[in-house]
Design a protein with these regions (language model features):
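Nucleotide-activated chemistry modules centered on ATP-dependent adenylation/adenylyltransferase
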Residues: 1-125
Length: 125
């Protein structure tokens, strides 16, 4: 979805200010750069600048993208170490009981699991 991170971060920033949160975390990562300009490091730098002038000066909110410089296989490996239940995650752009296996997101996910040397639990249902 074009501009999705602009939308997500804008809502998150508004809510964070209301509830006085100290940080917002977003899971954007390196492989998304090609199709989504709002996944690039330059976008996050610009959004952080905008946030500093767009919210109350007394309330500073950090915007953190800890996966930004990682690829899918690195994220999947990290998730495995952390016990992420990948069978409950969804990457496919289409609705259904099982991922389509054809969209870009499914291809990136399959490649990530393969490069990490792991089996995707969603594809083995």
């Amino acid at each position: 979805m074009p501009a999705r991170n602009i939308i997500f971060l804008s809502f998150a920033l508004s809510l964070a200010e209301v509830i006085k949160a100290q940080a917002i975390f977003i899971g954007a990562h390196a492989q998304d750069y090609s199709g989504y300009p709002d996944c690039r490091p330059e976008f996050f730098k610009a959004f952080i600048k905008m946030a500093k002038v767009g919210i109350a000066a007394k309330h500073r909110i950090q915007i953190l993208a800890p996966l930004l410089n990682k690829n899918k296989s690195q994220i999947i490996s990290l998730g495995c170490k952390q016990g992420v239940p990948f069978g409950l995650t969804w990457s496919c752009y289409r609705a259904g009981k099982k991922p389509c296996g054809e969209c870009d997101s499914c291809h990136y996910r399959a490649k990530g699991f393969k490069e990490a040397g792991l089996i995707d639990p969603l594809m083995n249902r």
